Amino acid sequence: MSVGDETTIFDFGNQMPKDIHDTLEIVYNALEEKGYNPINQIVGYLMSGDPAYIPRLNDARNLIKRHERDEIIEELVRVYLKK
């Protein structure tokens, strides 16, 4: 196998999902309070990594930057699929 053919495995151990959940709740509420579409803004942040999608209101920007974007996506998929 060549170097690019191997599957990389991510293991986040026992990352506290509640912590990510709480962060997303705060971010969602801050976005709503500012009058933005929270889903579009969060997706924009997760896709681009640009923190400008998230407001500073209620420290939402700093809170979401505490988590790696791939950890947030993993938790969203896990909760969506109930796994």
Swiss-Prot record:
InterPro entries: IreB. PANTHER family: UPF0297 PROTEIN YRZL. Belongs to the UPF0297 family. HAMAP family: UPF0297 (MF_01507). This is UPF0297 protein LCK_00468. It comes from Leuconostoc citreum (strain KM20).
